[in-house]
């Protein structure tokens, strides 16, 4: 018998019950005791094994994006962008690449309702011929903060109060009153699109600025955008209360049931690009994650489509153990100096090692589907069977070599070490433009949500005045409406 063929898998189920080590179990209902009513014996290894496994079924919850749902499918190139990227999976129209996607809420726990006002995660893992590519984003194209130094600090006030375990507006408004860069994100979150109807009817965005490199080594900054073919749909407060009150997993069920019924969700992938040589001509910093790139001067360019046509087989293996990291890229795609992206490159891999162990990339959902080889050996939960004698590099006994060189961005860095903010902050222009683009009733709902938040009894007069000042700088009439509703005199 080949012992490596029969690895743990549902494909090799025995016709009878066994222990984890494969020994047959003739009674899975009764403990081993001294007589029919005596104490249980410690030697009842089967009972001990069952209890020990049950006690360890749960792994650490994701610190953010704990609540989520996954599905599998494919990405197909529809437009040639080889002038921008030499990535193999983008090499020609018609090329298909397997993907797995995880949608999520951000702030609350694993069992929380999917109808809360919260950003949604939109993470895609491409299983390419040159390794995996993780595009880890959200449904909104911007973020709360622009520097990773603030990342942990911005999560804590959004999380429940550590004393009461209740999410409270005063904590959120207090923290972000120190960070007016968050205004643009709040113009999305407090808008009508703040509660997506479900995962199928929402946009996706790479959020951060990446870099595309072509075969000649020419680099372009890039933003990635997913657009659902079935359109964007959202829930207003009354609908969210109704839907969430009847099914707290409505978005997960909608995704699963739609795919099971053959109603496969589909998204188109678009990109925006900027030549780094010309970035100074814009009134925003392309590396500022709190800004969008205006589509009238930087139009969306179609790239491909993604279809989710298969449900996952096991929620734990393909959702809870599924791990994404923005550091996982392929030739033709690279990072930028986006300060938030630079932080995520480290943090995401680090949290996966904490949550799943140092060999998390060996788990089937995370492992590449292409051939791969290195000398990363051993460690906790290393289940890869390896029989080589040479576990070092280079060696004359091992033909393994370096891969062919591929282009990298030709960046030259110089400057003194310092901690500073970007020059082109411009925190108020874009949220003001968004607000003015809405219909009057949509504007009124936005105002009402802010009035409700600022009416928290623990929000001080100072904090209330700061937010009215911020929104007045974005749009004077918006600030005046807030001041009128709250009986606060605007400061500008």
Swiss-Prot record:
Occurs in almost all aerobically respiring organisms and serves to protect cells from the toxic effects of hydrogen peroxide. It is found in: Glyoxysome. Pfam families: Catalase (PF00199), Catalase-rel (PF06628). High expression in seeds and early seedlings. InterPro entries: Catalase, Catalase_AS, Catalase_clade1/3, Catalase_core, Catalase_haem_BS, Catalase_immune_responsive, Catalase_sf. Gene3D superfamilies: Catalase core domain. Homotetramer. Belongs to the catalase family. Keywords: Glyoxysome, Heme, Hydrogen peroxide, Iron, Metal-binding, Oxidoreductase, Peroxidase, Peroxisome. Its main location: other. It is an enzyme of class 1 (oxidoreductase). This is Catalase isozyme 1.
């Amino acid at each position: 018998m080949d012992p490596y063929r029969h690895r743990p898998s549902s494909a090799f189920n025995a016709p009878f019950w066994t222990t984890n080590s494969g020994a047959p179990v003739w009674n899975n209902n009764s403990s081993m005791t001294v007589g029919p009513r005596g104490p249980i014996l410690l030697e009842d290894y089967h009972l001990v094994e069952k209890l020990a496994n049950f006690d360890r079924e749960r792994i650490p919850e994701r610190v953010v994006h704990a609540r989520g749902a996954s599905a599998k499918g494919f990405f197909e190139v529809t437009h040639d962008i080889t002038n921008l990227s030499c990535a193999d999976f983008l090499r020609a129209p018609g090329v298909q690449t397997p993907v797995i996607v995880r949608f999520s809420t951000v702030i609350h726990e694993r069992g929380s309702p999917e109808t809360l006002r919260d950003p949604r995660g939109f993470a895609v893992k491409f299983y390419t011929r040159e390794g995996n590519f993780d595009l880890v984003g959200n449904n909104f194209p911007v973020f709360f903060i622009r520097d990773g130094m603030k990342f942990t600090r911005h999560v804590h006030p959004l999380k429940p109060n550590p004393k009461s375990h209740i999410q409270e507006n005063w904590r959120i408004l207090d923290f972000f009153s120190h960070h007016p860069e968050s205004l643009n994100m709040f113009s999305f979150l407090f808008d009508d699109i703040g509660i997506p109807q479900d995962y199928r009817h929402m946009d996706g965005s790479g959020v951060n600025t990446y870099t595309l490199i072509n075969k000649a080594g020419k680099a372009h900054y890039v933003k990635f955008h997913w657009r659902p073919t079935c359109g964007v749909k959202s829930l207003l407060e009354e609908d969210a209360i109704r839907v969430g009150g009847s099914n707290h997993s409505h978005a997960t069920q909608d995704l699963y049931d739609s795919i099971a019924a053959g109603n496969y969700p589909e998204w188109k992938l678009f990109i925006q690009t900027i030549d780094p040589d010309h970035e100074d001509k814009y009134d925003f910093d392309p590396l500022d994650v709190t800004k969008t790139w205006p589509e009238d001067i930087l139009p969306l360019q179609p790239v491909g489509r993604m279809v989710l046509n298969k449900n996952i087989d096991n929620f734990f293996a393909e959702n809870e153990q599924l791990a994404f990291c923005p550091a996982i890229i392929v030739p033709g795609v690279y990072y930028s100096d986006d300060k938030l992206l630079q932080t995520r490159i480290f943090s995401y891999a680090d949290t996966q090692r904490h949550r799943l162990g140092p060999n998390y990339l060996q788990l089937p959902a995370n492992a590449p589907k292409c051939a791969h080889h290195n000398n990363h050996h051993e460690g906790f939960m290393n289940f890869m069977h390896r029989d080589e004698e040479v576990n070092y590099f280079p060696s004359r006994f091992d033909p393994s070599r370096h891969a062919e060189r591929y282009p990298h961005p030709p960046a030259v860095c110089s400057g003194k070490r310092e901690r500073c903010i970007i020059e082109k902050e411009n925190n108020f222009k874009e949220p003001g433009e968004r607000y003015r683009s809405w219909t009057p009733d949509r504007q009124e709902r936005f105002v009402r949500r802010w009035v409700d938040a600022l009416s928290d009894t623990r929000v001080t007069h100072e904090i209330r005045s700061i937010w009215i000042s911020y929104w007045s700088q974005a749009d004077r009439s918006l600030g005046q409406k807030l001041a009128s509703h709250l009986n606060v005199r605007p400061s500008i």
